[in-house]
Amino acid sequence: MYSLARPFLFSLDAERAHALALRSIDTAYRTGTTALLARRPVPLPTPAFGLIFPNPVGLGAGLDKNGEHIDALFALGFGFVEIGTVTPRAQEGNPKPRMFRLPEYQAVINRMGFNNLGVDALVANVQRARRTGGLLGINIGKNKDTPNEEATSDYRYCMERVYPLADYITVNISSPNTAGLRELQEEQSLRRLISDLRETQEVLSAPHGKRVPMLVKVAPDLNDRDIDAAARVLADLAVDGVIATNTTVTRTLVANHPLAAEAGGLSGAPLLGQSTLVLRRLRARLPESIPLIGVGGINSGADAVAKMAAGASLVQCYSGLVYRGPQLIGECVNAIRRRREAPSGGAVSPL
């Protein structure tokens, strides 16, 4: 079905096609025809962060920024859906056009800039959702006009608002599309921010009667020394998990494309190798008690297996859905199932 719709979607501006695809998924959900888009995979229960995921394949943050399509997305067969990035106050993001497809490379460049309706709107949408079929992650960020010195207050405010509703919370400090945001990954800044948020997490756990896992999403552009420093901080502060990785600002593998000079984060197939290297290095340097989610460049079941082989407990797709459609979900689940059933399925590939 998606193969028939793709030529029309690709004839549209990328952001307009994005919105139309979401409306189509909603329509399929309301009319009970989601099965025409994707066959729900057989469950493959997967433990991580003290939770049991129905299957290990999730939706990465960015597709549903405001939590407006949660039930329709779960119906496609995701084991978990991550919504956001959401900020305390609504913001428009960067000027359009701000999303570009590179079909020759099965890639996307975006400079959305955390466009969202604000955390209160997201909370209202989540409260209305039925949320059947999977677990819900909520990805939080800071407003673009909040200085880094005050970033903790933005993240804390979002955490307090979404805590009762989230199955896990992701702290996004790695988007390249908010000026200065990635500076929060520097060792001392990271330690201050995550220490404060870990304290907030523990304070919130008592009144809500539950401890919601807190994950940190990192960039693929960190050098080895930065990765080692980040791993040191995240291990010291005992975060619940790490998502590796966000989009990249490098253009090495798409340098000859006419859109390569567009500012923003590159995602899709060219990111697979770079993001998987970061994932593997983090797995080698973090304790096994901190699970990893592998994201970046997954366009096939084999790509998902590569993430698992590098040490991921779960994987997420996003740009791959643009090129492959919802069938990618079941393909990834089934590939991971076959790997799990193989005699060497638990091995992590060496550095």
From Swiss-Prot:
CDD domains: DHOD_2_like
Pfam families per UniProt: DHO_dh
GO molecular function: dihydroorotate dehydrogenase (quinone) activity
Residues the record marks as active site: S175 (nucleophile)
UniProt GO BP: 'de novo' pyrimidine nucleobase biosynthetic process; 'de novo' UMP biosynthetic process
Cofactor entry: FMN
First-tier enzyme category under EC: oxidoreductase
Family: Belongs to the dihydroorotate dehydrogenase family. Type 2 subfamily.
Function: Catalyzes the conversion of dihydroorotate to orotate with quinone as electron acceptor.
Record text on subunit structure and interactions: Monomer.
Name listed for the protein in its UniProt record: Dihydroorotate dehydrogenase (quinone)
Native source species: Xanthomonas euvesicatoria pv. vesicatoria (strain 85-10)
